[in-house]
A protein has these predicted regions:
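Short glycine-rich loop/turn motifs that provide flexible caps or phosphate-binding loops at active sites
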Residues: 21, 78-81, 105, 150-152
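ATP/NTP phosphate-donor binding region
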Residues: 1-78, 85, 89-90
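Short amphipathic alpha-helical surface micro-motifs
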Residues: 31-35, 83-84, 120-122, 129-131
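Catalytic core of DAGKc-family lipid kinases
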Residues: 14, 43, 54, 93-163
Length: 163
């Protein structure tokens, strides 16, 4: 995998946002997602950009499979760790996997924090527009992909109750 990619050459780019991600107000998240979209249109061909809202994890499987089948180049996931994990879980089952960026819009956003991704639209687009690639090693437990840590018992109870 190269250390940098030329995002201007990407023909198919999608922003996927989960309107139910995190415990924040949807209007606030949507405003930030729209700002990312506006700024991205300044660095890539606007015709190559699609924005898709998901409302549940049930919608993720079909959308992520479509992304792979239609060979999207780059996906920006605006959501939390759960949204990102659900999408990557489907991607890992397909031959084609697009480049993935995360725009933190969930409760904790541990993956975004580990990758030093900002939730400020200007900073996010500035960073991703440089095309810097940060490979992430996927883990797998009980047939499911995980990106940072896997927890059971009390640990998972604590994560479910994070505010």
């Amino acid at each position: 995998m190269p250390n940098r990619v030329d995002i201007a050459a990407f023909q198919k780019v999608m922003i996927v946002y989960n309107r139910n991600s995190g415990k924040q107000l949807f209007a606030s998240m949507l405003a930030r997602v729209n700002e990312v979209k506006k700024r991205l249109k300044q660095v890539i061909d606007p015709k190559s950009l699609e924005i898709v809202e998901i409302k549940s994890f049930e919608q993720v499987e079909g959308l992520a499979a479509r992304i792979c089948q239609e060979k999207y180049d780059w996906i920006i996931v605006a959501g939390g760790d759960g949204t990102l994990r659900a999408i990557i879980d489907v991607f890992a089952k397909h031959e084609h996997m697009p480049y993935v960026s995360v725009f933190p819009a969930g409760t904790v956003n541990l993956v975004a924090k580990e990758l030093l991704m900002s939730n400020d639209p200007a900073k996010c687009v500035k960073r991703v527009s440089k095309g810097i690639v940060s490979p992430v090693q996927l883990g797998k437990a009980n047939g499911h992909i995980f990106l940072t840590v896997a927890g059971i018992g009390f640990d998972s109870l604590v994560v479910d109750n994070v505010s």
